[in-house]
A protein has these predicted regions:
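The feature primarily captures lumenal catalytic ectodomains
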Residues: 1-171
Length: 171
């Protein structure tokens, strides 16, 4: 990680400097044609492909309900591992609405346009990394923060249940 000043990467990434965000955006988009209508404008980030040590510790208990609700609103379910880095950049650049469980996939928000609406679903102790990044990228950020049903001492973890009315009101 390029910005660890206190020997604690988890703490350091909560608020990345704008210069790092700008540098990443510039370097990784330099020779890309970003406009591409082949990518969905609304999608849900499915973390079913997350490493087993993470996926067993942080899940949406009622994910099938969440996916059903989002599908009715024309959200496509995607796994970021199905896309190259270049295509992930294009995916986020062309997105209008993104919903997903708190996780590293939201780092791609730095490549989004400012009209993106991002909804993060997260355990209540997960921190503000995604929120801070979204705000620095001028993205419209919202979250549903839920007390975990199954809690792990690492505050980013825990299985959460999303209230369908809360989800409906925010999409």
């Amino acid at each position: 990680h390029p910005y660890v000043t206190n020997n604690n990467a988890t703490s350091a990434i909560q608020n990345l400097p704008q210069s790092i965000i700008d540098w990443m955006r510039q370097k990784l988009t330099k020779n890309l044609n970003l406009n591409d209508s082949n990518f969905p404008s609304k999608f849900y980030i499915d973390r079913g492909d997350a490493s087993p040590n993470i996926s067993k510790l942080r899940q949406i208990v009622n994910e099938n309900e969440v996916i059903d609700k989002l599908s009715k609103h024309k959200f496509k379910v995607i796994k970021l591992s199905d896309y190259s880095i270049k295509d992930q950049i294009k995916l986020f650049f062309n997105a209008k609405k993104i919903v997903g469980l708190h996780g590293a996939g939201f780092a791609n928000v730095m490549f989004s346009n400012t009209d993106l609406k991002m909804l993060e679903l997260k355990p209540s102790g997960a921190g503000k990394m995604c929120e801070n990044l979204a705000k620095k990228c001028n993205v419209i950020y919202d979250c549903i923060s839920v007390l975990p049903e199954k809690f792990n001492e690492n505050n980013q973890m825990g299985h959460i249940r999303i209230n369908m009315k809360d989800l409906q009101d925010r999409i």
